[in-house]
């Protein structure tokens, strides 16, 4: 049994109010009730999909992965322990704070806290309503989106996520960042989303390279792009990726890493073959400011 989808992300930020404005008025997320001093945001019928908590890191603090049942959660726990990972069965108080029925946690080889849970809270009685008019984000069985981690040991990270958590390799990109620098990105899936996680070995003062949210309407990408252009917050222009075929742009967050806002990613189907690429984009994704 593997994890089945990305359920939520937690980010430690130095300016919660700046994130509140960015998430709602630039990304189009809906603010949700949250513990005092923090902020949470919705993308769909779930109670929340990402949260920001105060602190100096301006970086990823936790990634929450979902499974479908208590039995599935126990199978993942057994798998991780057999792999040699210390797993903590979290308290009912933390589960209630997260809005889930059951919760375990562990730490990946790069030091990222992972929470694995079942029984997330649905809020159909309070329909999702984007403050910027985003029609719909693509979530459901594909989870909330994806994120990319900069890690010190790629082999250790890949082994953990594939052997420990049950991810599968989608493909690899050898990215020539500059004439002097080339990095290899590994893209991993745990459901039909082309990648829920990617890992890259590169010098970085942050774990989080970027996170991605996907809409079901191309116009929502263009409208978000216009909003970010107004703030001079575009890092990479509109473009289309070689591997997942997503049309997207990258914008700067108040914490310094990027958010990819996209549409149109292809789906991993049975019989998927792993391939490699020499470029990250078919067209576009030109640098507008330092990444």
UniProtKB/Swiss-Prot annotation:
GO terms for molecular function: biphenyl-2,3-diol 1,2-dioxygenase activity; ferrous iron binding. Pathway: Xenobiotic degradation; biphenyl degradation; 2-hydroxy-2,4-pentadienoate and benzoate from biphenyl: step 3/4. Fe cation binds at residues 146, 210, 260. InterPro entries: DiOHbiphenyl_dOase (IPR017626), Glyas_Bleomycin-R_OHBP_Dase (IPR029068), Glyas_Fos-R_dOase_dom (IPR004360), VOC (IPR037523), Xdiol_ring_cleave_dOase_1/2 (IPR000486). It catalyses: biphenyl-2,3-diol + O2 = 2-hydroxy-6-oxo-6-phenylhexa-2,4-dienoate + H(+). It holds the Pfam family BphC_D1. The keyword Oxidoreductase applies. Transmembrane segments: none annotated. Its EC number is 1.13.11.39. Its cofactor is Fe(2+). GO terms for biological process: xenobiotic catabolic process. Belongs to the extradiol ring-cleavage dioxygenase family. This is Biphenyl-2,3-diol 1,2-dioxygenase 1. It comes from Rhodococcus globerulus.
